[in-house]
């Protein structure tokens, strides 16, 4: 296995969350083993772009991946954590760079090792210096560069590593158990905080996602785009943002293509999952499905009808078991043309 040093940084949103999550995702790869993690640092941005400070760290990993394979997987991890490459050296949820790959020196179109900016960046070198041995090829060069950069305008200081979101949820669940009169240390509840934290990660998996990207568009004969494309009975579940109780049901989604553009059929259920797997209300889910589909396709019309059962209605308050809430949203021809709207509604009977 090859010893590799990675530099990581984040300056958007919950910075430590993105760093912890990136470490977790990297470590899940069967050909990557996380050996050491540096302290967490806060640094001022470089490059002239006005933006928030960064949280940085370094990783020492052992890998069986070749450099370009590793780079490709790193890009997958960055993409999964909402990395957008809009501004060079600009703000980002996560940035992962290969700094050193054993003693390798290489230069290809999209990868230079050692990283070409490494010896100009205090936030890269100081965390890595924690992880290297004195016999490392670049030890003396790193030590010298740190001494020189420490008197520059680059600001860097160690910060406290925060608990991961999962750890924070576990602590909160223990407090709730105490507050309702339970004993978190009794046998039946010992694993409950961890189970609840894992459950929240699963059912609120879209909570930190800023954009729906899981779709592909196709072209068809534009003369055949007057008919309705409908997928009905799409199951969904979500959690009410008012009481954090579940609600679940079915979504029915239709659109009329324009300019020969259609979306892969499996992507509409994925869109329903995306908008529902976060704290929300049914009205927002209904509108979000329609608005996002409109942004993607710019179709002639969109129709959405959602039917849901709400535990905040059935288990508390009025306690009306089996009651159904229906919400609808119409855009374009479905809003303006009664016949199209009725065709959609009658197809659901």
From Swiss-Prot:
Transmembrane spans: none
A single GO molecular function term of this UniProt record: zinc ion binding
GO cellular component: cytoplasm
Annotated metabolic or biological route of this protein: Cofactor biosynthesis; 7,8-dihydroneopterin triphosphate biosynthesis; 7,8-dihydroneopterin triphosphate from GTP: step 1/1; Cofactor biosynthesis; tetrahydrofolate biosynthesis; 2-amino-4-hydroxy-6-hydroxymethyl-7,8-dihydropteridine diphosphate from 7,8-dihydroneopterin triphosphate: step 4/4
Span list, region 2-amino-4-hydroxy-6-hydroxymethyldihydropteridine pyrophosphokinase: 1-226
Keywords from the UniProt entry: ATP-binding, Folate biosynthesis, GTP-binding, Hydrolase, Kinase, Multifunctional enzyme, Nucleotide-binding, One-carbon metabolism, Transferase
Coiled-coil ranges (or none): none
Catalyses which reaction(s): 6-hydroxymethyl-7,8-dihydropterin + ATP = (7,8-dihydropterin-6-yl)methyl diphosphate + AMP + H(+); GTP + H2O = 7,8-dihydroneopterin 3'-triphosphate + formate + H(+)
Sequence segments annotated as region (GTP cyclohydrolase 1): 226-349
InterPro entries, per the entry: GTP-CH-I_C/QueF, GTP-CH-I_N, GTP_CycHdrlase_I, GTP_CycHdrlase_I_CS, GTP_CycHdrlase_I_dom, Hppk, Hppk_sf
EC number: 2.7.6.3, 3.5.4.16
GO biological process: folic acid biosynthetic process; one-carbon metabolic process; tetrahydrobiopterin biosynthetic process; tetrahydrofolate biosynthetic process
Record's subunit section: Homomer.
Protein family according to the UniProt entry: In the N-terminal section; belongs to the HPPK family. In the C-terminal section; belongs to the GTP cyclohydrolase I family.
Record-given protein name: Bifunctional protein FolKE
Organism expressing this protein natively: Lactococcus lactis subsp. lactis (strain IL1403)
Gene that specifies this protein: folKE
């Amino acid at each position: 296995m090859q010893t590799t040093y990675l530099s990581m940084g984040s300056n958007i949103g919950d910075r430590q969350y993105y760093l912890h999550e990136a470490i977790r995702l990297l470590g899940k790869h069967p050909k990557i083993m996380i050996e050491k993690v540096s302290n967490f640092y806060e640094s001022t941005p470089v490059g002239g772009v006005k933006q928030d400070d960064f949280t940085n760290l370094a990783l020492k990993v052992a890998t069986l991946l070749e450099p370009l394979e590793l780079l490709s997987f790193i890009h997958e991890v960055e993409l999964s954590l909402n990395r957008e490459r809009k501004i060079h050296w600009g703000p980002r949820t996560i940035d992962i760079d290969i700094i050193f790959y054993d003693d390798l020196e290489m230069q290809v179109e999209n990868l230079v090792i050692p990283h070409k900016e490494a010896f100009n960046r205090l936030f890269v070198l100081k965390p890595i210096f924690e992880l290297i041995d004195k016999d490392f090829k670049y030890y003396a060069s790193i030590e010298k560069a740190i001494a020189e950069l420490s008197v520059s305008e680059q600001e860097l200081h160690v910060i406290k590593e925060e608990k991961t979101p999962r750890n924070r949820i576990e602590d909160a669940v223990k407090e709730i158990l105490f507050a309702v009169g339970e004993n978190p240390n009794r046998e039946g509840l010992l694993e409950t905080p961890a189970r609840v934290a894992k459950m929240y990660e699963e059912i609120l998996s879209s909570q930190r996602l800023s954009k729906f990207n899981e779709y592909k568009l196709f072209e068809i004969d534009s003369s055949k785009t007057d008919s309705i494309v409908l997928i009905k009975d799409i199951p969904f579940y979500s959690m009410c943002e008012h009481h954090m109780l579940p609600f679940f049901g079915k979504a029915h989604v239709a659109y009329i293509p324009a300019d020969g553009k259609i979306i892969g059929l499996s992507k509409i259920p994925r869109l329903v999952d995306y908008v529902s797997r976060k704290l929300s209300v049914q009205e927002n889910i209904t509108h979000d499905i329609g608005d996002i589909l409109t942004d993607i396709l710019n179709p002639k019309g969109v129709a959405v009808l959602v039917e849901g059962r709400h535990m905040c209605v059935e288990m508390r308050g009025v306690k009306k078991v089996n009651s159904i809430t229906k919400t609808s949203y119409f855009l374009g021809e479905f809003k303006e043309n009664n016949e199209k709207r009725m065709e959609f509604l009658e197809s659901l009977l």
